[in-house]
Amino acid sequence: MNEIHVKDGEGEGEGYRYSLSRSDKLFILAEALNSQTLPESEPYAGERQGASGEAYGETAGTYAFIVNHRGPSDREIKEEELFGVVNEGLETLKELGILPDSVREADRSAYDAVLYSAIDVLEPRNNVAVWKGSLSNIQKNNDRGNRLIDAYIDADDGKLYEFYVRTERTWADMDPDEIAGKWSGYLGLEAPQPYEGNNPLMEMTPYFKKYVFPGTGKGNTTATVGYYDGIQELFVKISR
């Protein structure tokens, strides 16, 4: 009871998952992440907001974010391929001006990777396979400057849906509107719209700006471009 199972019928030629638009994938992932009590990686979430005292992985509502124990399908990115794909994504984000050139490549040996499924519980065929890459605990006391700290990566095509990166840039060096626009183009989404009612207490930092990305079926997704000043960390996130 109270467990969610993901069946993959691709081996039988029927294709269990629906073909989802990018905006629907983004919406399902955001809702699933928001069903968690602590959507960020535990070692680094503490630096951002302090311990919550709650267990990671609890779910609520009609979406869930669970470990995908079956592993990637034949058409999904394998763990041994993941950080090559991640580094291609980082390079693209640099070319777009979202990240500075000083951000280092993600060395596979320095990161942990877990495959998850973001699921619409009421219609489980609507599910999104994502890798979560996080700088390893072993690296916690090492130099984290100019490094990718956390990311959620589409297991189908390697697009970075959410990421936290330590950078030499300050918030004053950044244009959140430009970052949001280029990130939406990178994902193939419609241009972001202003988020109405920005409240300075919505984040654990005063340096952020929120946007709404129109959906094609499921609904709109709110994304945040922000910056943690004390640890010099840029983030683009779709979770609360």
PLM region spans:
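Long, terminal "pre-/pro-" and other extracytoplasmic accessory regions
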Residues: 1-240
